[in-house]
Regions:
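OB-fold and OB-like single-stranded nucleic-acid-recognition modules
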Residues: 2-176
Length: 176
């Protein structure tokens, strides 16, 4: 669940159209491997899974590929499959065909005192086109919330890929 959303107009100079500064709590799903970036620097790569819960009881397991700069002598053996982990960093969304990939560039990793509950918490930044149709709705309890859509475009090889996003803002006032 993201705390806040920033909506900006489309920029041709930006490659990352949707990104989030987040803290993810989850379970390691793929063991760590040290790899080389194109420019020669090394990084640690591993996978994590986190479950996003729905009030209706339908839970969605999210797979995230994580990369973190490798520090010489760092023990990557502690990143074991099935271990609980908390990762802070930048989460990006990439679409290729029908598949949506979540990639995270980690700034901090913690294996100690990790919450037993899966979560994604942070701030989402969206560069794209927001719909002019903004609806103010009410919950069963009478609390107001705002619903609107937007889409982001990126070029993958010679094809354009579109990611449609539905935003829900739980505030009583409509933004100006």
């Amino acid at each position: 669940m993201c705390k806040s959303i920033t909506i900006s107009s489309t920029s041709k100079n930006k490659k990352i159209m949707i990104k989030a500064e987040v803290t993810v709590c989850g379970t390691i799903s793929r063991i760590a491997a040290v790899r080389n970036r194109k420019e020669g620097r090394q990084f640690v790569s591993f996978g994590i899974q986190t479950v996003v819960k729905d009030k209706s009881g339908i839970n969605k397991t999210i797979d995230i590929s994580v990369a973190k700069d490798y520090v010489e002598g760092e023990d990557t053996g502690v990143i074991r499959q099935g271990t609980r982990i908390e990762v802070k960093g930048i989460l990006t969304f990439r679409k290729k065909g029908e598949a949506l990939y979540l990639n995270m560039e980690a700034s901090d990793i913690s294996l100690e005192n990790v919450s037993g509950e899966d979560s994604i918490v942070g701030n989402l930044h969206f560069l794209g086109k927001a719909s002019k149709n903004v609806e103010v709705k009410s919950t069963k309890k009478g609390d107001s919330f705002i619903v609107f859509s937007g889409f982001s475009t990126s070029k993958e090889d010679e094809n354009f890929e579109y990611i449609w996003v539905r935003f829900v803002q739980f505030e009583t006032e409509r933004p100006g």
